Every structure is written in structure tokens, then in C-alpha cells.
Amino acid sequence: MGLPWYRVHTVVLNDPGRLLSVHIMHTALVAGWAGSMALYELAVFDPSDPVLDPMWRQGMFVIPFMTRLGITNSWGGWNITGGTITNPGLWSYEGVAGAHIVFSGLCFLAAIWHWVYWDLEIFCDERTGKPSLDLPKIFGIHLFLSGVACFGFGAFHVTGLYGPGIWVSDPYGLTGKVQPVNPAWGVEGFDPFVPGGIASHHIAAGTLGILAGLFHLSVRPPQRLYKGLRMGNIETVLSSSIAAVFFAAFVVAGTMWYGSATTPIELFGPTRYQWDQGYFQQEIYRRVSAGLAENQSLSEAWSKIPEKLAFYDYIGNNPAKGGLFRAGSMDNGDGIAVGWLGHPVFRNKEGRELFVRRMPTFFETFPVVLVDGDGIVRADVPFRRAESKYSVEQVGVTVEFYGGELNGVSYSDPATVKKYARRAQLGEVFELDRATLKSDGVFRSSPRGWFTFGHASFALLFFFGHIWHGARTLFRDVFAGIDPDLDAQVEFGAFQKLGDPTTKRQAV
């Protein structure tokens, strides 16, 4: 046929059988990738430390999506929360991966069958004998079926009526587990961080889809609308489908980057805004203050801070710290977290407590500045020692650790104090193993960052695809160079004055 690569889809333009075939093959490829990727991730995933080496630190991409839908067990005998199990059941991580691969194989065979047997009676218009599709009817069928699936997911899977529920956690990502969720029918259901909204919105959207599907199955579009929107043209279907996909991609890019109940931090890692706003730092200080109010010592109060909460308050877990072109997991960047060293408290020789100013998200380097409780600079690590007034040596800064592995240990040696001041810029101080994976010390993004970048990029690309194909189908006659009134203009007797549409003759 000699088609250039960008014109190859014309082979399925007037061939419904093979149009169906290539879509089934596409589904086979998507399902096959999902299953294969899941098996690869399971082969490299280390479930031994869900607190300091969770799935998002290891760069897992499909495991978090399975987990948020209720899969927590592996045929390898482990549970995602760190426990061991004896009977994982069919729907384990491996079971879901295998189901996708089997489904992919069946779709592959179905695609071949439909490619070979393309000329089916169902695709022929009985009036003309030519291949044709009743697109408004097909639209109604798809709307109805997707509505049923949407309603079923919200009413059965999410609520636990017939299914496991979904991953639900507290606001600080500490107590997450799979559990049934009751639909939230009040105004709280519109809060993106309320899991009940997931159930209620799927039930509502599914109901709407079912009703809309039945409407489109029982009511034919008006002729003027049918012609105006080119409802008989398959490229109209392509254009509107692309619109649905790019809109969904923009939405999920937003819910992933800014966070929501659908993207728990235990599965995808924290958001950059939680670092920017000191979200975890505030909660840690609140807990310490509450402990002190109960007559606990500083050491006791800090020792009760969960290691998981402290780890969230570390800049290396901020998805905006990784460059777009730095490949690999977070563990390949700053290393595998081994343990929390504790919270460093700095004091000058007068005994005044000093706080290290934290590094903002978009800085790679940042001056080490220590301020007092009023925000006044009291110490720093100077760039030029000759002009320094507030150096650690001059001010006599010491550091003492509370909680963690170095609980109760203090240092007054300036070199050690400066080392921990630099590390305190990055949040809570952790021991990181960079040898095991030959980590290079350069921060990487989490799957939250990759997902957002990928979906925002493809959404933009698909937006232009929607405009392109929409314009092609709406202005098909213009692009083809054929004026639809051309025959009327040259037809003898169509107009009182030849070629003048304002003098059109009335039919007798």
C-alpha cells in the first residue's frame, strides 16, 4: 500500500472488524505490560522494612496501585505491612499479575481472530450491504457498561459488600490498612482527602452512566445534531475519546501531585507541599509538646515519636527534589535508610536553643544558618571565615540528640556540630546505606513525581490530539477541498441565477 508511518491508521477507517481487532490488541499490550511489570517489581522488591524502605522508596510503580485496591499479600509468604502469612489466597500480588498476563494472551488470540475474520455480518448495514457502525448506539452500550462497572466498584468493592475495600490511612500516613469504606453522601464527600467520597462518587457517577447509556440506546440523536457533530464519522469518536482521556489524565496528575485519598502517602510517598509547609514537623513538635506537658523528659518525649513519622520529615522523600532525568529509585539516590539517629537540638554557649533553617524544595545547596526562637540569626557556617561573626567556633554551638539511635549523646567538637547542622537542613537525621546499591547521593523523585510528570505530559499531547482530530472531522469537507454545495451550484435550474445561492428555486 506504501503508506507513510503517520497514515497507517487509514487501513481500519472503513473496516469495523479490523478496527475492533487493533483495539483488542492494544488492550492485550496494556494488560501484558501491567502483569509483566508487576512480576518484575515483585522480583526486585524487598518487603523486609515497610517503615524505612517502603515500596515508594524502592521505586515501585504498579505495586502501590494494586495495594490501594486491596491487595496486600504475596505468594512469597509476606504481607505489605511487614508481617508473614500462610494463606495469601488467589488474589495476591502474583495472582493479579498472572490474571493480567492470562487476559493479555486471550486478548491477543481474539485480536488475531478478528483480524482474520473481519468481514462479519454484524458489521454490515442490511440496507446497503456495506460495512457500517451505528455509532450513537455503540456509544450508549459503552456508557451503560462503564456505568455498571463504575457503580459496581463503588457499591461493592470499595464498601466491602463484595470485595476487600480500599487502602485507608490517617492524615500522617502511619496507620494505613485495607478496610471497607462507607459512602460519604454529605458535603464531606467532596473533600478529596475523605475516602468515603470515592465510594459515593463511583455510585453516583455509575448511576448517571447507566441512565445516560439507556437514554442513548433508546433515543436517536436529532438529524441536525447528528450532522453538525459528524456523529457518523469514526474520527468524531476518536476525537471525543481522546478528550475523555486527556481530561482524566489532567485530573489524576493533580490528585497525585497535590495528594488525595486515592494517593495515600504510605503507597506513593509524601507530597512536596508537606515538606514546604512543615506538615510532619508540626505534628512531631505537637507530640513532643504533649509529652512534655505530661511531665516526660525531652528524651522520653522524642523517643515516643514513630520512626515512620520522623522519616516523612526528611527532604530526601520530597518528590520535587528529584531531577526529571535522574533514573532510578529514591534508594539509588541518597541510599537505603537504616535508622533514625534522633532529633538534634543545637545550643550556643549561653544555653539558648537554636534551630537550623531548613532547605527549601528547589535549592540544591543552602547556607547553614541557625536562628533562635525569635528568628534572629545566632550562628552559621560561613562561606568566608575571615569575615565571620557567627561561626560555630565563635558562638560555641553544641548539639545533643533526643530519641533515635543517638539518644542522649552530645557533641561539642565544631566539625561534628557543623556536620549535623548541615544534615539538619534536610529535616530529621537518618543513617543511610549508600554502599549496597552504589547510591550516588543525588536525590531522586518518587513514583508520585513520575506518575504526575507522565500523565501531565501525555495529557498535553492528547489535548493537541483532540484538537487535531476534532478539527479534521468537523472540517473534513474543507480539508478535502470539496464544497458540499458544488453540485447545486453547477446544476442547471437549481438557481434562478447560475451560482447565486440567494436565488434558489423553490421545489414545486
Swiss-Prot record:
Gene3D superfamilies: Photosystem II CP47 reaction center protein (3.10.680.10). Binds multiple chlorophylls. PSII binds additional chlorophylls, carotenoids and specific lipids. One of its GO terms (cellular component) is chloroplast thylakoid membrane. HAMAP family: PSII_PsbB_CP47. One of its GO terms (biological process) is photosynthetic electron transport in photosystem II. The chain crosses the membrane at residues 21-36, 101-115, 140-156, 203-218, 237-252, 457-472. This is Photosystem II CP47 reaction center protein. Belongs to the PsbB/PsbC family. PsbB subfamily. One of the components of the core complex of photosystem II (PSII). It binds chlorophyll and helps catalyze the primary light-induced photochemical processes of PSII. PSII is a light-driven water:plastoquinone oxidoreductase, using light energy to abstract electrons from H(2)O, generating O(2) and a proton gradient subsequently used for ATP formation. It is found in: Plastid, Chloroplast thylakoid membrane. It is a multi-pass membrane protein. It comes from Nasturtium officinale (Watercress). PSII is composed of 1 copy each of membrane proteins PsbA, PsbB, PsbC, PsbD, PsbE, PsbF, PsbH, PsbI, PsbJ, PsbK, PsbL, PsbM, PsbT, PsbX, PsbY, PsbZ, Psb30/Ycf12, at least 3 peripheral proteins of the oxygen-evolving complex and a large number of cofactors. It forms dimeric complexes. InterPro entries: PS_antenna-like, PS_II_antenna-like_sf, PSII_PsbB. Keywords: Chlorophyll, Chloroplast, Chromophore, Membrane, Photosynthesis, Photosystem II, Plastid, Thylakoid, Transmembrane, Transmembrane helix. The gene is psbB. One of its GO terms (molecular function) is chlorophyll binding. Its main location: plastid.
